[in-house]
From Swiss-Prot:
The keyword tRNA processing applies. InterPro entries: Domain_X (IPR024937), Maturase_MatK (IPR002866), Maturase_MatK_N (IPR024942). Belongs to the intron maturase 2 family. MatK subfamily. Usually encoded in the trnK tRNA gene intron. Probably assists in splicing its own and other chloroplast group II introns. Keywords: Chloroplast, mRNA processing, Plastid, RNA-binding, tRNA processing. This is Maturase K. It is found in: Plastid, Chloroplast. The keyword tRNA processing applies. One of its GO terms (molecular function) is RNA binding. GO terms for biological process: mRNA processing; RNA splicing; tRNA processing. It comes from the Eukaryota. GO terms for cellular component: chloroplast.
Amino acid sequence: MEEFKGYFEFDRTRQQNFLYPLFFRESFYVLAYDHGLNRLNRNRSIFLENADYDKKYGSLIVKRLILRMYEQNHLIIPTKDLNHNPFFGHTNLFYYQMISVLFAVIVEIQFSLKLVSSFEGKLLKKSYNLKSIHSLFPFLEDKLLHFNYVVDVRIPYPIHLEILVQTLRYRVKDASSLHFFRFCLYEYCNYKNFDIQKKSILNPRFFLFLYNSHVCEYESLFLFLRKRSSHLRSTSSEVVFERILFYGKIQHLVKVFVNFPSILGFLKDPLIHYVRYHGKCILATKDTPLLMNKRKYYFVNLWQSYFSVWLQSEKVNINQLSKDTLEFLGYLSSLQLNPLVVRSQMLKNSFLIDNVRIKFDTKIPISSIIGSLSKEKFCNVLGHPVSKSSWTDSSDSEIRERFVRICRNLSHYYSGSSKKKNLYRIKYILRLCCVKTLARKHKSTVRAFLKRLGSGLLEEFLTGEGQIISLIFPRSYYASKRLYRNRIWYLDILFFNDLVNHE
């Protein structure tokens, strides 16, 4: 990172970042290949999109691309001819793909350098456990007990490419880079019938860069307004976010809501917790039904008026946690109200006190999981196990290892469930599916195969889970039944494991 820092240093009196010359440097294409793509997708990279490519020719491909960019007239080819005009064995689409990834890497480095410089001289607390997906659930368990409503919003996608380009203008001031990026984006996406919601982009890094830029602009504005309009002169956000005519846009937004003065009034309440996940976001607060409806229409008008993005009111759901369930990261979350009667006695008088105990309840969505298992041919739609015929060509040990891995991953992730009954049902489906698969491979019945194999097969499914729990809890506590009734949140789950992928 230090060797590339000099390329991003600029004269702060002019406040300009000239990124366009970096597209003609071969070293940055190497950085995009080594640093970027291998981390996101190790089994696939941009240089391997062409079947005839060999690694030793990577430098030659980059040099040809740079030479072709110098010859601008030869780079511009109609979209319909993109795939019919190969250049030295590679299509123009292949080169547009390389440029798009390079643009994402360059801008990411620029933002990271600014972010590091903004924290110089400050002490930052490092907590690697907060990276875990399960770390959100203890937070919600602690905070949602004091709130009664949750606004569940599906973040809309921009319907036009120019909206994405305009979003980048707030952070990238180099006009040449933006024009070049706009040209490549339109040419590439027109050929591929671009749809950001369907993720038809071949480069995961480029897609994440566009999506995060879009969401970052939305979040920065929302969090900015949440601190009330009296903070408009705050300069704390200038380090990370650079906008064009930022104050003017805020004034325009206020004019849009001139007929809704009460909508902006609810922003005075600082007790709003915000969480974003899987293209959705939730806001937890303690409000009245009237204020929650105002909050809903605020989101709709914010997206339509400021971001020029159509947001249907049906995509903004208001959930009352005591009555409704919230689908959150694979769990069905809600607040369970348990009545509690306490007998109190003062001197000679005794009386009963009715109290309500609020508990954060997390359940396993058994219907959706069975649907996923049915789609992958582990069971039918009713949840009855079937044999996995596509795995019968593998060895017995490999088949058992695949099923045990899937069962272990599910047990590991859904260990935070309040009720383990549904988890045991999923384990039963996988165990019996494994037995049926092995019996089908050996052309035997399930009963005869289990009689010949014994109980050793079923013990393998319990060994993996037992080893994990025994490393955390003492043996006496692990052996007790109380452990299986309590929820366990693991802080080492950084991503969702593919249940079927065995590579």
